Amino acid sequence: MGLSLVLSCGVIAGISGFLFGYDSGIMTTTIAQEQFLQQFKPKESMVGTIVAIMQAGGFFGCLTAGKLSDLWGRRKAIMFGCVFVVVGGALQAAAYHTAMLLIGRLVTGFGVGSLTMTVPVYQAEISPPRWRGTIVGCQQLMLAIGSAIANWTGYGCSFVNSSFQWRMPLALQAVPGIVLFFGSYFLPESPRWLVEHDALDAALHVVQRLYPDKQNLDSAYAEFQEIVEQIKQEKAQASERSYLQIFRRKAWRKRLFLGAGIWLMLNLTGINVINYYLTQFFTSLGYKGRRAIFLSGVYGSVGAATTFLALFFVHRLSRKTPLMMANISQTATLIVMAGLTAASELGKSGQMGGVAMIFLFFVIYCSTWGPLSWVYASEIFPTQIRSKGYSMASAVNCEWRFYFLFVATNFISALVLLFLYPETSGKSLEAIDLLFDDHQTIHRSTLEENEVRRTSESVNAKH
């Protein structure tokens, strides 16, 4: 009981992070497998679609899970996401044409997105304050382990000369989904969700189980009372907890923007671009085929080891300072990486330097942004809107941003056209000048009046 139970719950629920890492990582190696390329013969644009469509499903999974998590509870919402992961993995492994593969990726993405929203909220709500950073950070550790295993699985299967080369790795996506589904039966429900639904006795029992030893029972009861009073106060302040209400209340709106901002800044570090197209990066540096897949495996292993070590310190660190220092360090790393990639004449030393910069970038990320982003985004929302708020914030962590980047630019372009660009259709070139307040321009009506006046004067002179 106590800390061992909290850690067990964090690790079991963290299998969702393993799913996220494995599902993302396995496609990195799959799109480089010879048998996969022979089966689907994808063009470069289709490769991008195969990679990104999972995150499109994840976007909708995040938004759906917020409501379901409030209605059903955190445990049932986790099980809900697992069903989609298992079905999606089966569809991908059995795919014989691109459409079936895309549907499988979309379904899997929906499940992973649902879990990405639900699990960090659950982990934050069951964790004593002192250990919250470590427990929620388990999500990133499991993600790193999943990514590493995906890379090594892809490397091992690359030696097989049949469709097993890519079907087996894709089929394995379903295994952690099944484990998490049945493991969820043994997880205690979130005490904050229980209090929210007036199950006070059950909530107190869970809180007492989650505290380290009997000497802390008084502290457990004190925290229980704090949870009850906080939720009671939140209910009194606002009975409505819709998504729209989050935007209406200033304090909630600020939390949402901060939570979404964390994920947006994480993605703008460039980590997902590097992870998804890792083998292509290595190929551009001269490490092709199986060598690129092997380096991907080493890359994933380094990330898992770094994250594991970081969890021993994350609960002792502040949140902001490590993130800011990481951004500065990653900026320098990316500049060097870009220079080495561009300077192809540097030869083998330049190639090795480029690989080293990729690894250094990943080490910095895994020790800072990796675990701390999950922690910060999950702990800033009040219980009353934690699921809905985090679901909207975590949706930013899905790769729909690659599309919504263009959604944003198109929408902004529409506004610019509406308010700044004058309409020119049906106007003469001279009349168009008037639209820009050109005082040197003579309006057509003025020209016509002058012409009429000159004609009239000419006629009168003749008479």
From Swiss-Prot:
Keywords: Membrane, Transmembrane, Transmembrane helix, Transport. The keyword Membrane applies. The chain crosses the membrane at residues 5-27, 46-66, 83-103, 106-126, 141-161, 168-188, 256-276, 293-313, 323-343, 355-375, 402-422. It is found in: Membrane. Pfam families: Sugar_tr (PF00083). GO terms for molecular function: carbohydrate:proton symporter activity. Belongs to the major facilitator superfamily. Sugar transporter (TC 2.A.1.1) family. This is MFS-type transporter criB.
